[in-house]
A protein has these predicted regions:
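Basic, nucleic-acid-interacting segments
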Residues: 1-225
Length: 225
């Protein structure tokens, strides 16, 4: 007899915030410029620079939280996340760890999924929305890789869902609803061809009816342009 398993899916959506300038400097928030031409000492992390938070990015992240029924923090802070990767020119990222701007939200899904099958009318929980800076971008040319740091420092929301989805259809419906919400509120263009909305997917399997989570597999950087 076949064992009845179910998928448990959670999503991390990375959404660029539509602002005039980058997160911590006055460089313009643009797309499509020649590589490594939209840079300054702050977004390159030169010694002695003093980053200043972008008020517009903070306000729009709070608006995103309100649109998703989140609790808005009365006190929040930024942290340095240190790691070494070619697209992270500073070798650290300014992000939020234990005090995000928004937490405990939800997104409503209903209707049909991409397969055409009807979806359950349900809410997908949202763990948190925190604000950070986007890293640079790797461009691959045959056997060579070039680094474009123009994207470095663009304000980026990381929107983390609860593991409440049970199918690819539900995950698709959640992302469609999230994208429509961000576009409607003017928070982001969510142009996936420009990398303005990207996803990491966390998937595990368990016997249907169980509550314990299984071993998680993470699929990173879906729809990264």
């Amino acid at each position: 007899m076949a064992v009845n398993y179910e998928a448990v899916i959670g999503l991390e959506a990375h959404v660029q915030v539509r602002t005039k300038s980058k997160m911590f400097c006055k460089c313009p928030n643009t797309h499509g410029a020649e590589p490594n031409t939209v840079l300054c000492p702050i977004c390159m992390g030169y010694p002695g620079v003093l980053p200043t938070p972008n008020r517009e990015a903070i306000n729009k992240t709070v608006a995103a939280g309100l649109m998703c029924s989140c609790e808005i923090a009365l006190k929040s802070k930024f942290d340095r996340k240190s790691y070494f990767y070619p697209d992270l020119v500073k070798n650290y990222q300014i992000t939020q760890y234990d005090q995000p701007l928004c937490k405990n939200g939800k997104i409503h899904i209903h209707g049909t999924g991409f397969s055409g099958e009807p979806l359950p009318d349900k809410y997908i929980g949202m763990t948190r929305i925190h604000l950070e800076e986007d890293p640079g971008k790797s461009n691959h040319f045959g056997n060579c890789t070039g680094m474009d740091y123009n994207r470095s420092g663009i304000p980026l929301m990381e929107i983390v869902s609860e593991p409440d989805m049970r199918s690819a259809d539900e995950a698709y419906a959640y992302l469609v609803a999230l994208r429509q919400t961000m576009q409607y509120a003017g928070i982001s263009d969510c142009d996936m061809e420009k990398g303005q909305m990207r996803f990491d997917v966390n998937i595990s399997m368990r016997l249907r009816g169980e509550t314990k989570l299984g071993t998680k597999v993470e699929i990173k950087n879906l729809n990264d342009s």
